[in-house]
Amino acid sequence: MARYIGPKLKLSRREGTDLGLKSGVKPYDVKTKKSARPPGQHGVSRNKSSEYSLQLREKQKVKRIYGVLERQFANYYKEAARKRGATGENLLAMLESRLDNVVYRMGFGSTRAEARQLVSHRTVMVKKAGRDEFIRVNIPSIQLQDGDVIAIQEKSREQLRIKNAIELATQRGIPEWLDVDHSKLQGTFKKAPDRIDLPAEINESLIVELYSK
């Protein structure tokens, strides 16, 4: 399955909620004011959604939020199921612990897609907990561990898009499970987030039900 490169707002309209795929400069409800209906000629279906369709839709929504493809998502689920604790919560914690997502959460990218691009272009450096040196990385899916430090490399620190992203993050707020110093353009991954720290609009139990069939 190829990565979607079409209009991002259309995906949010299809799911009926803001997936965070756009920068957030203009509020989601303003951008969709002309039509809150899903895209397409007929908009909302009159047929009641089946249990399976609701489960599948929730999986699609989460995949789109984090920019993860089908096989990769299935692998995350398998790993989450092997871990101790609630599978759905483990799944979300793993997705939130991805390097590209943390770069976004820290405010160095205005969207996850932009954060992913920063990582792919080797703009981001990581210092593993207990190590003394930063290393440049280009793999967005790296799973961060407690105490890992992220920084923007020196020659990229004046990029306008990074400065704009920090302004947006200041308005959005930084999660409690991260410690960020925007003046130094670096931050620490303190720990994986608990469920209370994660997006409330996600119903991970539907995804667990889907994979349990």
UniProtKB/Swiss-Prot annotation:
What does the UniProt function comment say about this protein? One of the primary rRNA binding proteins, it binds directly to 16S rRNA where it nucleates assembly of the body of the 30S subunit. With S5 and S12 plays an important role in translational accuracy.
Swiss-Prot/TrEMBL GO biological process terms: ribosomal small subunit biogenesis; translation
Where composition is biased (Polar residues), the residues are: 44-53
> By its UniProt entry, which Pfam families does this protein fall under?
Ribosomal_S4, S4
Name this polypeptide is given: Small ribosomal subunit protein uS4
The organism is: Psychrobacter cryohalolentis (strain ATCC BAA-1226 / DSM 17306 / VKM B-2378 / K5)
User: How does this chain assemble?
Assistant: Part of the 30S ribosomal subunit. Contacts protein S5. The interaction surface between S4 and S5 is involved in control of translational fidelity.
A single GO cellular-component term from the record reads: small ribosomal subunit
Asked if the keyword RNA-binding belongs to this entry, the reply reads yes
Annotated ranges, domain S4 RNA-binding = 97-163
Concerning InterPro entries, the annotation shows:
Ribosomal_uS4 (IPR022801), Ribosomal_uS4_bac-type (IPR005709), Ribosomal_uS4_CS (IPR018079), Ribosomal_uS4_N (IPR001912), S4_RNA-bd (IPR002942), S4_RNA-bd_sf (IPR036986)
Instruction: Name the protein family.
Output: Belongs to the universal ribosomal protein uS4 family.
Keyword annotations for this protein? Ribonucleoprotein, Ribosomal protein, RNA-binding, rRNA-binding
Q: Which SUPFAM superfamilies match?
A: Alpha-L RNA-binding motif
The organism's lineage is: Bacteria, Pseudomonadati, Pseudomonadota, Gammaproteobacteria, Moraxellales
**Any one Gene Ontology molecular-function term assigned to this protein's record:** rRNA binding
Residues of the region (Disordered) are 16-53
